[in-house]
A protein has these predicted regions:
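Metal-dependent peptidase/peptidase-like ectodomains
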Residues: 5, 15-109
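Flexible, small-residue-rich helix->loop connector segments that border functional cores
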Residues: 1-7
Length: 109
């Protein structure tokens, strides 16, 4: 990132109770710090890699976000590749915290 002030507000939110029905992310989506109409996108990091550097970036719900082309460009610049989740039949896109914002029109990845 460049030094200096960001051109936008940046919010880092840690939510809880995903397994209990997305309670934390639903609460934030209903009570956002910045109106959702002004929210340009979000990144959900649900599980972090503890095994070291990898070449792939796994997208949950491939094809469901207009942020994917940007992610693909950034990944390519790092010598990485974007891949879809290995088991889409599990419906993880609809059971993860990003869905609370995505269903309200916020581009999420």
């Amino acid at each position: 990132m460049k030094a200096g002030a960001a051109g936008r507000s940046i919010i880092f939110a840690a939510v809880t109770a995903e397994e209990s029905g997305l309670l934390g992310s639903d609460y934030y989506a209903a009570n956002p710090l910045i109106p959702l109409a002004k929210t340009v996108g979000g990144i959900n990091m649900d599980g972090l890699n503890i095994l070291g550097r990898t070449k792939d970036v796994v997208v949950i719900g491939p094809g469901k976000s207009e942020l994917e082309p940007m992610l693909e460009r950034l990944a390519k610049a790092q010598g990485r590749v974007v891949v879809g989740e290995p088991t889409p039949e599990k419906g993880s896109f609809y059971r993860s915290d990003h869905f609370s914002l995505a269903k309200r029109g916020v581009p999420m990845i």
